[in-house]
């Protein structure tokens, strides 16, 4: 299985590839606070990214390379996110006694029950959640899948600029973690927040 979730890794750049631009962010941690060390953005040529899918990997790679020259960071590991119609996420239930490897094998065998694509076409990952509230001895498992091409094009674009994709996350979950981080830093109460709104150049998403 390919990693689609955020795994712990130090010194990563966050690179957001949208339909109209690329944004790069580098954070440093001081105590329990985070500080923006570098931030830069560049517009993308029309048609380089269409409906959140990279259509022209060379153009995207060139713009990321220009960002790399601009920010002059020594960090080469990067985190990117996938989203759109090529991403599938759902919660399934598996036997709680299974190890992660056994869960992986079972998901592969039963993949056609959860994913409407051939296994050859997708990258899959999963994350063990809480015990099932309905079925004793079962555990909820968050299953995520994305068209493999969508992942590989992002990896290729980063490599063209000299970066390595250490994390390929799902945009909605990356947004959730970013909100958690910001709410803790700004002393906000999550209970008072009813929605998160992402206002982009061509679309607005409400989480």
Please state what every model-predicted region is.
Residues 39-44, 48-49, 133, 182-207:
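Oxyanion-binding/catalytic loops of NTP- or PPi-dependent enzymes
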Residues 12, 140-142, 194:
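Short active-site oxyanion
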Residues 81-183:
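Active-site neighborhood for divalent-cation/phosphate handling
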Residues 21, 33, 136-140, 203:
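A generic structural signal for beta-strand entry/edge sites
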Residues 1-110, 152, 162-164:
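Non-catalytic, solvent-exposed interaction/assembly segments
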Residues 16, 79-83, 144-145, 197-200, ...:
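Short beta-strand segments
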């Amino acid at each position: 299985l390919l990693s689609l979730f955020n795994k712990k890794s130090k010194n990563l750049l966050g690179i957001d590839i949208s339909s109209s631009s690329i944004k790069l962010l580098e954070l440093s941690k001081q105590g329990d606070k985070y500080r923006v060390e570098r931030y830069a953005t560049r517009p993308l040529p029309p048609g380089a990214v269409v409906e959140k899918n990279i259509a022209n990997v060379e153009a995207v790679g060139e713009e990321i390379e220009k960002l790399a020259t601009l920010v002059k960071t020594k960090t080469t590991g990067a985190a990117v996110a996938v989203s759109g119609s090529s991403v599938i996420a759902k919660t399934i239930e598996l036997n709680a006694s299974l190890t992660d490897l056994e869960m992986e094998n079972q998901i592969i065998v039963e993949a056609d029950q959860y994913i409407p694509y051939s296994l050859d076409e997708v990258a899959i990952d999963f994350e063990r959640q809480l015990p099932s509230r309905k079925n004793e001895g079962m555990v909820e498992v968050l299953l995520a899948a994305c068209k493999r091409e969508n992942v590989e094009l992002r990896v290729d674009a980063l490599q063209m600029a000299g970066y390595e994709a250490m994390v390929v996350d799902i945009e909605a979950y990356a947004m959730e973690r970013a909100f958690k981080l910001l709410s803790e830093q700004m002393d906000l109460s999550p209970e008072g927040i009813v929605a998160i709104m992402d206002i982009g150049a061509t679309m607005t998403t409400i989480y």
